[in-house]
From Swiss-Prot:
Lineage: Bacteria, Pseudomonadati, Pseudomonadota, Gammaproteobacteria, Moraxellales
Key word Signal present: no
Keyword Oxidoreductase: yes
Matches recorded under InterPro entries: Aminotrans_V_dom, GcvP, GDC-P_C, GDC-P_N, GDC_P, PyrdxlP-dep_Trfase, PyrdxlP-dep_Trfase_major, PyrdxlP-dep_Trfase_small
EC numbers: 1.4.4.2
Gene: gcvP
Keywords carried by this UniProt record: Oxidoreductase, Pyridoxal phosphate
Domain of life: Bacteria
Subunit and partners: The glycine cleavage system is composed of four proteins: P, T, L and H.
GO molecular function, one term: pyridoxal phosphate binding
Reaction equation(s) it catalyzes: N(6)-[(R)-lipoyl]-L-lysyl-[glycine-cleavage complex H protein] + glycine + H(+) = N(6)-[(R)-S(8)-aminomethyldihydrolipoyl]-L-lysyl-[glycine-cleavage complex H protein] + CO2
Coiled coil: none
GO cellular component, one term: glycine cleavage complex
Listed name of the protein: Glycine dehydrogenase (decarboxylating)
């Protein structure tokens, strides 16, 4: 006798249902999928797929992956790997320190989908919370560096240093091709600088910082505090080098700047560094938000994003991303940087650390760190041991002890490891001990006993040993936001008030084309705060991180199975970084064959702007290839240009499915053509959500591909970062993947330098993708791809009678996204794609991608995670908006093209309850245009933002409180 008429419940296997997560991730079950198929004219999924995905690219075999695991089983398996990680107390330093993230910030920001599932704040009206948090971050950076402006974060300290070098060349009036680097910089920073400089033809000169005075350099970069922990006043050196038209950047420890004289006071043009010490776990290297501060005159040359203060249509203060046309991916062929993302979630965490602790709190923490280091140095000095010598008198947190012999240094180092402490070796005889905000009395006892054989207690008085000339005298963090939220209740409510201003995926679908805003499941997110993954230093001894490396190796094997490639590099910490690493491998490969002149890169005109920007960074000549009327690469033009540049052809950069959202029939032919002429095929993985289980990029001819783990493999977008962009490559390119000075990659050549600061990039978020793949299994991953394709085609079919669908494949099908053309409606009514985007906010939705890859269009990518009900709400909103536009054109009910719900959108609660309603439509039409909105209303916190005003009156620091009243 069975307990159910459902056969699946007649066996224990069915009762356990290991594949249950698959149906939690997918927005529609089998019955709903049947409804979707029926709506577009199909009776089964197989027929639909056969007419959507070209037969020549199809993968007619199962992925070499295990079947799905349950959430519990996947977490248990990951736990076994985490248990194989030893978390010693880290006193390594070298740019990474243990921290204490305030619990109120961890729970209410890092672990809150209202913060981590949002997209980059291009739609400012529904992103005021994140924008305010980022403005706080910028204010922290401005205050501590003393410079006039700061960006909203870069990827990490080392890449920020490389960006400073590129910016120096843009801004400097020097004709020199040499860039000076202080020999006191961290090795990983120099590694990334060398990588970036090579293909621009810049010579990196490394030496004692005083030597910068005598050379002719377009830029100079100094470290403050140095790799040995020493603090040097750079004022005289900076003044001297600036006389030679040298642009000066200073890499600064953010926590040290709480006490030390600011870079601006010493004359720096740029200050940069990591904000990891402001409450962000080390995470085996990342993710962390780098800061980048600069002078006002350099604002149009600075990399990355800048948050600025503007006004909305009602005259109220509103925030936005400022000067967007200077972003590198928009500048395309004119760029010398491809930066198009940042670390928003991490920047918000760091900014909130300053908000919660306030000026007094951060000064107490910084002073405690320094006092620990001073007390430790005093113990060593007072021991009167001739073998031990403290190298520097002026330091912030790191004390370097010369042990006099390699034997003694090795003995102390090993003894420290034996009792659970990691120190750092500098050469044969020197040990560095870097104190942090987690240092305590027990640590002090242990560390002193390691060096002088007797445990010492902390002295009663906390001594500051820095000379007064090194200390700052100006006030920091004086804005009210840093002085108002120091109790947990106040902080909790402040965070909630910001969260409520933002529309994230915990509210509704975000259908941004080419962005893949899919479910970020809670079970995928849980492991990132496990101490084993969060609290490990990237340069910890390898025998302590066996489980971490095992997890990363396992993820690499998963990605190899999915893509068909022979090897994977996990170092790139963004999609753009992955592009860079991919082209870098291609250039190095050609050089290994003696073909140094293969410097032409073919790029379809529809490509994302990072593609030509990346090619320019690699010293390549960009040749644009036409696309045909169906959105495909023009094969005739590609053939002609391949033949024209045959002897110099280095690479083709291509996105598949195309940026136009179509599976190109001729992708194999395209790859064969490039190979025939000696080039390599770089595939952009932005649209990989249409590939997984359906095809393999290596199989169709790609040589290298970057994978956006923050798109296809479920790392959340974080409101604009973090991301990960690992690259898969064929065997002939594998030796040329990025390496690392301090942690070499086993199969990369020694002379291949790094593309990011840490060996594995943003390692602590890799468990998210590992969990996703493990829980979906080979069959679930294919189901996800099928449903992503089905959802996009359902949306296209439902909207095609209202908005033209711009591109389709041979059988009238799109891939995983579709482009609807707004230009005919705009020509007829004057209503633009921007008006539609703003009006969608009133309907509770974030706009699809605007005007990319075609101006005057919207690109929609619903992903597999959205239900039919949510798709139908979105479709009904777009249909209703079309009807509103036509009503305005017809002049019904006194609506006009100049005064209607679209051009006045979005409507805030303040507008709707205003006693004087002057619009020709009702308040209900403004705020509740469809019935579903009544039960789930999202109110934009500001009306339409004035972009022109914001750029003309640029203000990128926190406004006074009166501006909000």
């Amino acid at each position: 006798m069975t307990i159910s008429q459902n056969p699946a419940l007649d066996t224990f296997e069915g009762l356990f249902n290991e594949a249950e997560f698959v149906y939690r991730h997918l927005g529609s079950n089998d019955a709903k999928q049947a409804d979707l198929l029926s709506a577009i004219g199909y009776s089964d999924m197989a027929t639909f797929i056969n007419e959507t995905v070209p037969e020549p690219v199809r993968l007619h075999k199962e992925l070499d992956l295990p079947v799905a695991m349950s959430e519990h089983a996947a977490l248990a398996k990951l736990r076994t790997m985490a248990d194989d990680i030893t978390v010693n107390k880290s006193y390594i330093g070298q740019g990474y320190s243990p921290v204490r993230m305030p619990a109120v910030i961890q729970r209410n920001v890092l672990e809150n989908p209202g913060w981590y599932t949002a997209y980059t704040p291009y739609q400012a009206e529904i992103a005021q919370g994140r924008l305010e948090a980022l403005l706080n971050f910028q204010q922290v950076c401005i205050d501590l560096t003393g410079l006039e402006l700061a960006g909203a974060s870069l990827l990490d300290e080392a890449t920020a240093a490389a960006e400073a070098m590129a910016m120096s060349k843009r801004v400097s009036k020097s004709k020199s091709m040499q860039f000076f680097v202080d020999d006191r910089v961290y090795p990983q920073t120099l590694d990334v600088i060398n990588t970036r400089a090579k293909y621009f033809g810049w010579e990196v000169v490394v030496g004692d910082f005083e030597l910068a005075k005598s050379g002719d350099y377009f830029g100079a970069l100094f470290q403050y505090v140095g790799v040995e922990g020493d603090v040097k006043d750079l004022t005289d050196v900076i003044a001297a080098v600036k006389k030679n038209k040298t642009y000066v950047s200073v890499v600064s420890d953010i926590m040290s700047l709480v006490l030390l004289k600011s870079p601006a006071d010493m004359g720096a043009d740029v200050a940069l560094g990591s904000t990891q010490r402001f409450g962000i776990p080390m995470g085996f290297g990342g993710p962390h938000a780098a800061y980048f501060a600069f002078s006002d005159k350099a604002k149009r040359s600075a990399p990355g994003r800048i948050i600025g203060v503007s006004k909305d249509s009602q005259g109220n203060t509103a925030l936005r991303m400022a000067l967007q046309t200077r972003e590198q991916h928009i500048r395309r062929e004119k760029a010398n940087s491809n930066i198009c993302t940042s670390q928003v979630l991490l920047a918000n965490l760091a900014g909130m650390y300053a908000v919660y602790h306030g000026p007094g709190g951060v000064k107490r923490i910084a002073t405690r760190i320094h006092a620990f280091a001073t007390a430790f140095a005093d113990v060593i000095k007072n021991a009167n041991d001739s073998n031990l010598n403290v190298l520097h008198d002026q330091f912030f947190d790191s004390v370097v002890v010369d042990c006099g012999s390699e034997k003694l240094a090795s003995q102390i180092f090993q003894n420290a490891d034996n009792v659970g402490y990691n120190l750092w070796r500098l050469g044969e005889t020197k040990l560095s001990v870097a104190f942090s905000e987690t240092s305590d009395q027990k640590d002090f006892n242990v560390l002193t006993q390691l060096f002088v054989t007797k445990a010492h207690d902390l002295p009663e008085d906390a001594r500051v040993s820095l000379d007064s000339a090194h200390l700052r005298t100006d006030a920091i963090l004086s804005h009210p936001v840093f002085n108002s939220h120091h109790t947990e209740h106040e902080m909790l409510r402040y965070l909630k008030s910001l969260e409520d201003k933002d529309l994230a995926m915990n509210r509704s679908m975000i259908s941004l084309g080419s962005c893949t805003m899919k479910l970020n499941a809670t079970s995928e997110m849980l492991p990132i705060t496990w101490p084993e993954f969060a609290n490990v230093h990237p340069f910890a001894p390898r025998d302590q991180v066996t489980g971490y490396v095992a997890m990363i190796d396992s993820l690499q094997e998963q990605l190899k199975a999915i893509t068909g490639f022979d090897d994977v590099s996990m170092q790139p910490n963004s999609g753009a970084s992955g592009e860079y690493a991919g082209l870098l491998a291609i250039r190095r490969y050609h050089e290994s064959l003696g073909e140094t002149d293969r410097d032409v890169c073919l790029i379809p005109m529809s490509a994302h702007g990072t593609n030509p920007a990346t090619a320019m960074m690699m010293g390549m000549k960009v040749v644009v290839v036409k696309t045909d009327d169906n959105g495909n690469v023009d094969i005739d033009d590609l053939t002609a240009k391949s033949e024209e540049h045959s002897t110099r052809l280095g690479a083709l950069m291509i996105t598949y499915p195309s940026t136009h959202g179509v599976f190109e029939e001729g992708i194999r032919k395209i790859c064969d053509l490039i190979h025939k002429h000696g080039g390599q095929v770089y595939m952009d993985g932005a649209n990989m959500n249409a590939q997984v289980g359906m095809m393999q990029p290596a199989d169709v001819g790609a040589d290298v591909l970057h994978m956006n783990l923050h798109k296809t493999f479920c790392i959340p977008h974080g409101g604009g970062g973090p991301g990960m962009g690992p690259i898969g490559m064929k065997a002939h390119l594998a030796p040329f993947m990025a390496n690392h000075t301090l942690s070499p990659v086993h199969n990369a050549q020694k002379d291949c330098s790094a593309v990011s600061a840490a060996p594995y990039g943003s390692a602590s978020i890799l468990p998210i993708s590992w969990m996703y793949i493990a829980m979906m299994g080979r069959d679930g991953l294919l189901k996800a791809t099928e449903l992503a394709l089905l959802n996009a085609n359902y949306v296209a079919a439902e909207l095609k009678d209202h908005y033209p669908v711009l591109y389709t494949g041979k059988n009238g099908r799109v891939a995983h996204e579709c482009i609807i053309d707004i230009r005919p409606l705009k020509e007829e009514t004057g209503i633009s794609e921007s008006d539609i985007a703003k009006r969608l906010m009133d309907y509770g939705f974030h706009s699809p991608t605007m005007s990319f890859p075609v101006a005057g269009t919207l690109m929609i990518e619903p992903t597999e995670s959205e239900s039919k009900e949510e798709l139908d709400r979105f479709i009904s909103a777009l249909k209703s908006i079309k009807a509103e536009a036509l009503k305005a054109k017809a002049g019904e009910d006194n609506w006009t093209l100049e005064n209607n719900p679209l051009v006045n959108a979005p409507h805030t609660a303040a507008m709707v309850i205003d006693g004087e309603w002057t619009y020709p439509y009702s308040r209900e039409t403004a705020a509740f245009p469809l019935p579903y909105i009544r039960t789930n209303k999202f109110w934009p916190s500001v009306a339409r933002v004035d972009d022109a005003y914001g750029d003309k009156n640029l203000m990128c620091s926190c406004p006074s409180i009166e501006n909000y009243m």
